[in-house]
Amino acid sequence: MSLFKARDWWSASLGEKEEFDQGCLCVADVDNSGTAHDKIIVGSFSGYLRIFSPHPLKPGDGMQAEDLLLEVQLRDPVLQVEVGKFVSGTEILHLAVLHPRKLCVYSVSGTLGNVEHGNQYQMKLMYEHNLQRTACSMTHGPFGGVKGRDLICIQSMDGMLMFFEQESYAFGRYLPGFLLPGPLSYSPKTDSFVTVSSSRQVESYKYQVLAVATDADSRKENEQQKMGAGKKVVADWILNIGEQALDISIVSFNQTSFSIFVLGERNFFCLKESGQIRFMKKLDYSPSCFHPYSSVNDGTINTLVGNHNNMLLVYQDVTLKWAAQLSQTPVAVKVANFRDLKGVIVTLSESGQLQCSYLGTDPSLFQVPKVESRDINYEDLDVEMKELQRIIKEATKTQDILPKMEKDDDLTLVATVLPDLDSVSQAVDGEVESEVIPSVSVKLCVRSRLTLQKAVLLISTPAPLALTQDQFIFDSLEPGVSKTASASVFLKGNYPPADLEGSAVVSYSKPTELNPEGVPRIVQCKFRLPLKLVCFPVQPSKVANHKLTIDTNKPPVNLINLFPEFIDQVEEDQVSVVGFQLLAGQKVTLLASKTSQRYRIQSEQFEDLWLITREFILRFQDYFLKQGIKDFTCSFSGPVPLQEYFELIDQHFELRLNGEKYEALLSERAVQFRAIQRLLLTRFKDKTPTPLQNLDTLLDGTYRQVIGIADAAEELQRNLFRAFTRLKSATQLVILLIGLWQKLNKEQIAILEGTFLPLLKDGQELGWEESVDAALSHLLRTCLSKSSKEQALNLTSHLSIPKDTSRLKKHITLLCERMSKGGRLSLSADSGSQQAAEMQGTPINPSVS
């Protein structure tokens, strides 16, 4: 904010709810009074044209009636007003008014009044041009070096320059590569037009080049080509400024050289006539308008710059000389000479605040209003404080973040998985190498207590399981009426899933008194898919690389009671072995001991053990629960197969490292491809044809490399997703074994799941290894710490891909060791010191809780 404000000399408020822009302000001796006193011409988008001649009785006065010389309402919006020698046969000034579809030239004259009401002014239409295209802006000047008259150039919204030689239309030309209109100005010294294109380049076009180019109005291109007439419009010079421009002004004062000023969105440029930068100024604000004017110092130019902070800044070249506060944000600024004062700054705001001001040292003061004082009643304050404390106490009784659900939900969702597989498989686009890919149907029933509109049902299953349809939309739900939806689930990818649990969610909006459109609500349910969806019975295998032994506290159970769908009815009463063949995995064998209470699960792939082991324990629990036995437990005597687990971690991590290499290689080839493109573009733009020197061959080869690397990167991402799914299966198996080994409760198993499975999806920026390592470090530093020194260690707050997996493996091993020595998982703050004291004693037997 400036220390000083612009001193108000004269001001006026124009109309009501009218809008103004950059071209709506002009200052000139439009009535040719001969006194060299300027008048202010203002046009508005509402079609009003006003001419003012300020004569304040004292500085700061508002507009008097006699200050308004003329006010006319035109039929069309006024886009721009200019004053020049626009009428042939005379060199007096006339007023040009640009409308969207019309150009009008008027003569403004005044008649001396004989009475006290003052002089009379009138505006006479000299000629007009109806435009075939919608106009955007115009500029004028002695095009082609003519003497004693000004020609007009209008820029249309579609990029055409229309030239008018006073009363007659001359020709029209299209600017090359046009997209959106930009500021346009004429340079008398070089006889050229300067604009800023949509490519963020300052471009200069010679008038002679435009005059002899192909006629834009003539569509008989074939005839012109036969006659040999017309040339291509080519820019004289181009300068890339890298931003859009707000305005262009071309000045040439006596003591300074010719200069082209360009006001950008963040920079202010001064160019030479050849397009070279004379100087530039980086602005730390958003400018709204500018106006260069003559400086008292030789060789310099002063510039007024208005910004959106209601500031007016004065620069001498690049040096800030003065800053003043304005009452409004200016959209146009000019410098005018009036009868009583010269060098007046005229500003116009978007809402029509016209202000004439000068720079001075009138401070911009802000006085804080006095606060109304009142006597304080401490007894009333105590009563109010107690009431507020009571309200806060009641509000903090519950720690729930989400609001409590009602006893009877507005909407219920029930999912039912059919017991039998589909007679005709619904699998489509499967990648599994199997003759038959089974599918199972899931039926979902939605029932509402209220009338609801636009309820959306979404179904999701873990990859690589897929659905025939995963989204259903119910346009309306009536109270008490059930609606059902059905979809089939099948295995699509050529690898086993990490889970067989799916979920369904219904989202809807419930109208309330405060929000009639409805408050978003959701209802969700989960369903478990059958094991036979991903495997089928086979002959058991006696040997395998990976084996697990599960102990129970109950006598052996006939496996036909646990897996009836996988075992055919046989004459033997006791079945002690079952074989499972995963559709996208290895064979898994389940063996039951006939003499002990042990069961063995074995397979050639470690991660393939997970689904069968999990299903085996769940069916065991259901079997004994149906018989009313509640003290059934399973246990694992160890050791936890960490080496097999570490191999899967290394495979997943190696794919992540390869992904980074592919990204770096793809980035390098892309840079090379763009560099070759630039070289080729330079050769093609050169007016003198030169050999390509095999650049086209190099471009084609680089393009093929980019496509090949991109395809390889996509294939790597698919392999990485498969590896993450296998790692997730192995991780869940390790968590299950640790829970059985240490007899962990549900809360402790939930901590392990949150530690080892923090991500639903793996990625390059945030991957599984660094996330799990950070969580393990926290557990080892808190509840599983051996001493207070470990608790004092600070963890890094930045997660990045590690160099290798040695640190992660070490932390996983430490976790198992410390849990075997009595460490217990807990999220409480004081658990770390207690566990440290326990683990400093005698080691505890791993099989004892």
Swiss-Prot record:
Where does the protein principally reside?
membrane
The segment annotated Seven-bladed beta-propeller runs over 1-407
Q: Where is this region: Disordered?
A: 825-849
UniProt keyword annotations, A-Z:
Cell membrane, Cell projection, Cilium, Cytoplasm, Cytoskeleton, Membrane
Q: Where is the composition biased (Polar residues)?
A: 828-849
Which GO cellular component does the record give, naming just one?
A: centriolar satellite
Record-marked site positions (Critical for protein stability): 141
Quote the subcellular location field of this record. Cell projection, Cilium membrane; Cytoplasm, Cytoskeleton, Microtubule organizing center, Centrosome, Centriolar satellite
* GO annotation (BP), single: cilium assembly
Q: What does this protein do?
A: Required for ciliogenesis.
For this entry, the protein name equals Protein PTHB1
What organism is the protein native to?
Xenopus laevis (African clawed frog)
